[in-house]
Amino acid sequence: THERSSAASDVYKRQALIRDKNFFNWLELNSENLALFEKNEMKQMIRRCAELHMHQISNGGDPFEMGSARPLDFGHWSAHKLESMTNYRLRHGEAVAIGIALDARYSVLAGMLDKGLEERICCLLEYLGFKLWNVAIEKTNKDDGLELIKGLKDFQEHLGGELTITLLKNIGVGFEVNEIDISIVQESIQWLKERQK
């Protein structure tokens, strides 16, 4: 079930959060059956994801993601770093769920996303079985800075030199930014830690 849950986080963020508010609403309405991996709901979810993915490939302008804008990487800058920081004990989908939560909160604190929507996003992730905190998030480096923040630099290199992060304007509406305010990232991390208490 870990593998199925991990795949669900990719579905959730790639398709519903950055592209399709109605799909997000459907996920919420069907979350109980999705959490149980009920066949009918899973088939509907997979079909809608495939449709949205095909739309991105055929209409996105960059089907092989050769440029720096990669909307399907929503939640990934921190996820990639968390995976390596935990020696991959944290699975990709689990790390992406945390990344989604951080980026949703960042979107709120930066004034892009309405307050309360980040909580709605987190609640659905948790209902689907994801833990949105890991002690590695607080790991510091030799300079007493958060090791996770280095994930931004790593992600920039992964993108070929230009930092492009997908954030949210609304559920179903993703957009790219080229700069990230570290202090807002730190506030987002603190918020995520406090909501786990």
Predicted feature residues:
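A structure-centric signal for secondary-structure junctions around beta-strands
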Residues: 8, 68, 160-162
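Amphipathic alpha-helical interaction elements
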Residues: 14-15, 105, 109, 157, ...
